[in-house]
A protein has these predicted regions:
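Active-site glycine-centered loops adjacent to acidic/histidine catalytic or metal-binding residues
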Residues: 80, 108, 259
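ATP-binding/phosphotransfer module of carbohydrate and carboxylate kinases, centering on a glycine-rich
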Residues: 1-30, 38-46, 65-73, 90-101, ...
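Short beta-strand scaffold segments in enzyme catalytic cores
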Residues: 111-116
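Conserved beta-strand elements of the Class I
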Residues: 103-105
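Short loop/edge segments at beta-strand edges and connector loops
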Residues: 77-81, 85
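A charged helix-plus-loop insertion that forms the helical arch/lid used to bind
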Residues: 44-59
């Protein structure tokens, strides 16, 4: 069974979430993939909280504690992109790809990334925040004095390449921008830089880009071209069309699958 609803206030959204799961009398565990940043340190007093998020009214919200009051079951709590990365590895390995190391980016209203290495999430005291790394500005953005839209860093990857940056540059929402616009090559240059950073840092077998901005075929092709230009043959990778790809599970289903498998791991 599936239910979708908008993310509104914490009180309303978490109530709807609890109401949905409370219907299942044999519920054993749940998996949550949340937007972040979140506290995933089990020893922390604020474990299970959304912390300093850019999303209005959601900072310092106790997600796990609130749901546990209604649903007395184990909860696997991680980021939405970690869930997606886990789901991608699971789906791809089930069809015989034998993936051990994978990076999953979502490029939508924000940017985040999750990394799976040998079946485990990458992260020390917390999870990666790879959407907020700094990137080299595109010459057109420099010429136009475009600072970026991230409320914390302005010109980080998210500030320059997430969906809202398209509208900030053009005054038009991304889905209404013609594919001939220069703005797509600007976006591709930043997304390719993210892929370069992931390649050189983790040496993954696969980089997956999900989210609304990447849901257009022309964007993937632009990123492929720019990635090969920037990497310039420095390290070997699989053929770019096999290396930098879109999700294996349709309709953002990677996160749902990942959350299911992670929840199941709590009761096995």
């Amino acid at each position: 069974e599936e239910l979708q609803f908008p993310t509104t206030t914490p009180k309303e959204t978490l109530k709807k979430t609890a109401d949905f799961f409370a219907k299942f009398k044999n519920l054993k565990a749940i998996g949550i993939g949340s937007f972040g940043p979140i506290d995933v340190d089990l020893k922390s007093k604020t474990y299970g909280y959304i912390t300093t998020t850019p999303k209005p009214n959601w900072s310092n919200v106790d997600v796990v504690g609130t749901l546990k009051k209604r649903l007395d079951v184990p909860i696997y709590f991680t980021t939405d992109v970690n869930s997606s990365a886990y789901g991608e590895v699971y789906a791809r390995n089930n069809r015989g790809e034998n993936i051990e190391t994978l990076v999953y980016y979502t490029i939508g209203t924000g940017i985040g990334a999750g990394v799976i290495q040998r079946g485990e999430f990458i992260g020390g005291t917390s999870h990666p925040e790879m959407g907020h790394v700094y990137v080299c500005k595109h010459p057109i953005d420099v010429a136009n004095n475009f600072d970026g839209v991230c409320p914390f860093h302005k010109g980080c990857l998210e500030g320059l390449a997430a969906g809202p940056s398209l509208e900030a540059r053009t005054g038009v929402r991304g889905e209404h921008i013609d594919i001939s616009s220069d703005v797509w090559d600007i976006q591709a240059s930043y997304i390719a830089q993210a892929a370069i950073q992931a390649t050189l840092t983790f040496r993954p077998e696969k980089i997956v880009f999900g989210g609304g901005v990447m849901a257009q075929n022309h964007m993937v092709e632009r990123v492929h071209r720019k990635f090969e230009e920037l990497l310039n043959g420095y390290v070997p990778t699989p053929p770019v069309k096999d290396f930098i790809v879109t999700p294996a599970v349709d309709n953002n289903g990677s996160a749902t699958l990942g959350n299911y498998v992670l929840a199941k791991s709590l009761v096995q």
